[in-house]
Structure formats: structure tokens, C-alpha cells
């Protein structure tokens, strides 16, 4: 709904008040009083709005208005009342005789609010800024990129290298047999497990990457020349064994004696094969497969006869080819043939 307008706003004069209008308004109020501000302009013969007449009288034409600047005592009163009443300017003005609410409001917005901003600054902040130590002097020169990068300090892992893995340095060699007539070895060994892979604490057992106690894996597996190299560092970082996983293999040698049997026996000790060896190598299966392959090999005479038969067949094929193409040409005939072809 709202309040009804004070006038029709038709034919109303706007802008600055003239001295004649000020005298007319003052004479009418002094003789008739303020009365109703809605009907006052019409009764006084002013072409002004009732609101404009009221503000002109209260703020400028009253006889009890105090002129001049606001004193420091009045400033203190305004500050105290503003802290309790807020922006209720008319109530503040009632405690300051001769001052209008509009004047107090303008003075607060233009002067006092700016002064109070400096008054209420925390002294601790000002003292901290004033008493701050000077910044340290920088050494001349450019800052390196490494110094500008953020540094992340990581707690190094306790990388323990057990020295308890001790195995006998030995080779497991499948036996080589000798023929009684001394014709030489029948065949090389099928498998040799070098002692370098089971050397001891310096060369721990093999295992898949990440199977170690700490799960670390050596990221670099290349040697100095860029080739793949299985050195001690890779073994140390890939898999480490302790005493509980140590593999002890006893050496085995075949008895190569002239008067011994053609197929000498062999013995592999399984004294201390622990759980780790059983997971990766089934020694019984290796032994059985090797013995089976050994029994299936033919003797030396059959091998030699097969080789001789192959050579005879090749000679027959070459002779047959020469018969099909005729006798080979001598050098003179070949030269003549080449000259005829090039002519």
C-alpha cells in the first residue's frame, strides 16, 4: 500500500529555493505554525512540494538552528550515541540542540567515519608493522633453479641387507659318462647350475621382482654399455633371502673311471632344501626328466653311422646333378662362352 503522495506533482517547481520563497515560508510558519505539511504549500501560495517545504524549514530556516562547524564536544557525543543507537540520526540530533539530523548524518559520513577508522586500529598491529625486523640481505647473483624448486624430504626406508644367506659354492652338473674303450665323452652335460647364482650373502637367490621383504625393485637393469646385465645389484634389490629361505645344495660329481660302468650313477643331496627352493625348482622332476632324456640317446656308433650316411647321400646327389648337366667346362671354354654372351 504505502503512504499517499503529498501532492499531485503537477506544476511543482523544483531546484534551488530562492530568497523570496524562503521569506514566504518563514512568514507563513511564524504566523500560522507548521500545521499540515500537505496543505501548507497551497495555503502559503508556494509551488513546492510539502516534503520540500518541511526539509527547507527544519534544516535551514528555523530560528534555533546552530550555525558553524561542529565542535569536538559534539563529535564525542555523536560518536558515543552512534555506538549505542546506530544510524538513528533524528534521535541523535535531539540530544544536540541546534543540530539537525541531516547535518549530523552528512558530518558522520564525510568526517567522523574516516577519523574513527584510524582511532580504532589495533595498536598491536601498528606496533608489529613498525617494529618488524628488516628483511635479510640477499647475496648478489642469480638464484639457481634447484634452489627455487620445492624440496620434499622423504623418510628413507630402513633397507636391511641380510648377510645370513650362506650356501656352498658348488656346481650341479649332470654326469658325463666315458666309454670303456676310451673313445671319449658321449655327450656334454644337460644342465649346469653355476655357483655365481648361489654364491652367498653377496649373491642372494633369484625371485620375481617385488617379492623381497621390502618390495623394492631395481629400476636400472642395464650395464655400462646399455645391454641387459644381471649383476649383483639387481639380485640384491629384487630378492633377498635370509636363513629361513636359504638353499643349500651339496656338490655332486660323477666317477669317470675307465673300469666304471658306462652310465655312472649320480647323487644329489637333498639335505637342506627349504621352502623357497621347493616353490621355484622341483629337483625331483628335473632329475627324472634328465634321466629319461639320457636313456633315450643313441650310442656313439649309431650317431656316426647316421652322419656317414648323410655324407654319402649328398655325394650321390652332387654326382647325379653333374650327370644331368653334362661335363663341366674348362677355363678356355668358359671364357669363350662369356665373350660370346657379351658380344
Swiss-Prot record:
Promotes flavonoid biosynthesis when expressed in tobacco (Nicotiana tabacum) through up-regulation of the biosynthetic genes. It is found in: Nucleus. One of its GO terms (biological process) is response to light stimulus. Residues 126-146 are annotated as: Disordered. Expressed in seedlings, roots, cotyledons, leaves and apical meristems. GO terms for molecular function: DNA binding; DNA-binding transcription factor activity; promoter-specific chromatin binding. Transmembrane segments: none annotated. Disruption phenotype: Accelerated germination, faster hypocotyl and primary root elongation, more lateral and adventitious roots formation, faster development of the inflorescence, and more lateral inflorescences initiation and fruits. The double mutant myb11 myb111 and triple mutant myb11 myb12 myb111 accumulate less flavonols in roots, leaves, stems, inflorescence, and siliques. The double mutant myb11 myb12 is specifically altered in flavonols content of siliques. The triple mutant myb11 myb12 myb111 is impaired in flavonols biosynthesis and exhibits a reduced UV-B tolerance. Its main location: nucleus. Residues 37-61, 89-112 bind DNA. Pfam families: Myb_DNA-binding. Keywords: Developmental protein, DNA-binding, Nucleus, Repeat, Transcription, Transcription regulation. SMART domains: SANT. Residues 9-61, 62-116 form the HTH myb-type domain. One of its GO terms (cellular component) is nucleus. It comes from the Eukaryota. PANTHER family: TRANSCRIPTION FACTOR MYB11-RELATED, TRANSCRIPTION FACTOR MYB8-RELATED-RELATED. Modulates overall growth by reducing the proliferation activity of meristematic cells and delaying development. Flavonol-specific transcription activator involved in the regulation of several genes of flavonoid biosynthesis. Activates the expression of CHS, CHI, F3H and FLS1. Confers tolerance to UV-B. This is Transcription factor MYB11. It comes from Arabidopsis thaliana. The gene is MYB11.
Amino acid at each position: 500500500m504505502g503512504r499517499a503522495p503529498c501532492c499531485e506533482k503537477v506544476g511543482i517547481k523544483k531546484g534551488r529555493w530562492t530568497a523570496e520563497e524562503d521569506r514566504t515560508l518563514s512568514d507563513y510558519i511564524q504566523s500560522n505554525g507548521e500545521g499540515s505539511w500537505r496543505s501548507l504549500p497551497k495555503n502559503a501560495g508556494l509551488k513546492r512540494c510539502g516534503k520540500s517545504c518541511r526539509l527547507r524549514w527544519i534544516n535551514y530556516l528555523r530560528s534555533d538552528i546552530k550555525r558553524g562547524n561542529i565542535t569536538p564536544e559534539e563529535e564525542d557525543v555523536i560518536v558515543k550515541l552512534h555506538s549505542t543507537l546506530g544510524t538513528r540520526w533524528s534521535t541523535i540530533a535531539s540530544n544536540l540542540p541546534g543540530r539537525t539530523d541531516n547535518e549530523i548524518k552528512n558530518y558522520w559520513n564525510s568526517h567522523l567515519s574516516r577519523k574513527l577508522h584510524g582511532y580504532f586500529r589495533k595498536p598491536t598491529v601498528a606496533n608489529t608493522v613498525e617494529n618488524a625486523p628488516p628483511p635479510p640481505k640477499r647475496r648478489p647473483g642469480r638464484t639457481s633453479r634447484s634452489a627455487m624448486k620445492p624440496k620434499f624430504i622423504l623418510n628413507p626406508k630402513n633397507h636391511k641387507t641380510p648377510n645370513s644367506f650362506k650356501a656352498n659354492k658348488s656346481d650341479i652338473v649332470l654326469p658325463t659318462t666315458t666309454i670303456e674303450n676310451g673313445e671319449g665323452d658321449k655327450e656334454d652335460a644337460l644342465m649346469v647350475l653355476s655357483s655365481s647364482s648361489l654364491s652367498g650373502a653377496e649373491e642372494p637367490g633369484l625371485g620375481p621382482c617385488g617379492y623381497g621383504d621390502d618390495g623394492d625393485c631395481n629400476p636400472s637393469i642395464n650395464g655400462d654399455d646399455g645391454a641387459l646385465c644381471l649383476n649383483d645389484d639387481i639380485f640384491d634389490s629384487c630378492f633377498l633371502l635370509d636363513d629361513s629361505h636359504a638353499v643349500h645344495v651339496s656338490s655332486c660329481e660323477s666317477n669317470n673311471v675307465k673300469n666304471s660302468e658306462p652310465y655312472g650313477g649320480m647323487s644329489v643331496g637333498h639335505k637342506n632344501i627349504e621352502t623357497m627352493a621347493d616353490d621355484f625348482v622341483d629337483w625331483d622332476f628335473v632329475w627324472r626328466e634328465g634321466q629319461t632324456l639320457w636313456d633315450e640317446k643313441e650310442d656313439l656308433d649309431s650317431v656316426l653311422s647316421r652322419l656317414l650316411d648323410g655324407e654319402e647321400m649328398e655325394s650321390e646327389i652332387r654326382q647325379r646333378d653333374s650327370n644331368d648337366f653334362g661335363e663341366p667346362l674348362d677355363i678356355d671354354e668358359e671364357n669363350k662362352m662369356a665373350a660370346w654372351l657379351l658380344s
